């Protein structure tokens, strides 16, 4: 129990909390080395984790790392866990790939006894701290913790050392169409651009605006203006001029948004009648809203 608690507290600090400094313990030549130390494991006994958060590796940078490893060796051990007769990577797949390319037969590694969820959390935290994940990979990592491991957004934020709002905003990106998510993943669009584009309700228009923003390299502020113009134009094209809201109604909407912590739209269809729309961005977010409404 103490061991599990120590691992959980260490997650937000990354793998440095779980990996001893190189040289702090003698590196053995085989699995007979002390469990807490650095082992030299056969490279063919180590396998990548198909569910690891990072999916893209820059080939040019891999080549550079491979050349560095040929000259200097692997300076930081990879982190693995036992998997059948071999080992599965928790963190360090890039170093492992580069070591293979460099022709190494063994790599320094540390074996850790962790659960699947702990292994995924460690991989996610390490990639976040190294800024190795693009925004979509980061969002998909959070989503897996929520969907597969049944963590709430609040629990995810604690585990990875991020604000809950950061986790919630990242998850919102997954509502974007595939082609636009691709632009965010390859850096053509930033998180700020993506958040602005989420305000476009019609899918074809969102895709067109995203391409325009990427092609013209517009700033986030310019993108926000473009989205606002698009929304205003769409309302005019529909022939439905939005009725001017009274100060009382505006105040009510602002109060609802403050209490619920999300976007709220109020439409009056006739005096005293209308509809209220409340945005949510995941089942976890919906559950949070329902608890607020039930005053749980």
Curated annotation (Swiss-Prot):
It holds the Pfam family ParB_dimer. It catalyses: CTP + H2O = CDP + phosphate + H(+). Belongs to the ParB family. InterPro entries: Chromosome_partition/occlusion, HTH_ParB/Spo0J, ParB/RepB/Spo0J, ParB/Sulfiredoxin_dom, ParB/Sulfiredoxin_sf, ParB_dimer_C. Residues 134-230 are annotated as: parS-binding domain (PBD). GO terms for biological process: chromosome segregation; positive regulation of sporulation resulting in formation of a cellular spore. GO terms for cellular component: chromosome; cytoplasm. CTP binds at residues 52, 54, 68, 73, 75-76, 92-95, 126-127, 130-131. Its main location: cytoplasm. Residues 199-221 bind DNA. Homodimer. Forms a loose homodimer, binding of parS DNA and CTP cause conformational changes including formation of a tighter dimer, and closes a clamp around the DNA. Changing residue 94 to A: Binds but does not hydrolyze CTP, does not accumulate on parS DNA. Coiled coil: none annotated. Mg(2+) binds at residues 126-127. Keywords: Chromosome partition, Cytoplasm, DNA-binding, Hydrolase, Nucleotide-binding. Residues 247-296 are annotated as: C-terminal dimerization domain (CDD). This is Chromosome-partitioning protein ParB. The active site is at 93 (proton acceptor). Residues 223-249 are annotated as: Disordered. An essential component of the chromosome segregation machinery. The ParABS system segregates newly replicated chromosomes during bacterial cell division. After DNA replication the ParB-parS partition complexes interact with ParA ATPase, promoting the movement of the origin region towards opposite cell poles. Binds DNA close to the origin of replication (the parS cluster). parS sequences (but not a mutated parS sequence) stimulate CTP hydrolysis by ParB. Upon DNA and CTP binding forms a closed sliding rings that spread one-dimensionally over about 33 kb of DNA centered on the parS cluster. It is found in: Cytoplasm. Has 3 domains, the ParB/Srx nucleotide-binding domain (NBD), parS-binding domain (PBD) and the C-terminal dimerization domain (CDD). Forms loose dimers via the CDD; in the presence of parS-containing DNA and CTP forms a closed ring around the DNA. In complex with CTP part of the NBD exchanges into the other monomer, forming a tightly interlinked domain with 2 CTP nucleotides shared between the 2 subunits. CTPase activity is stimulated by parS DNA.
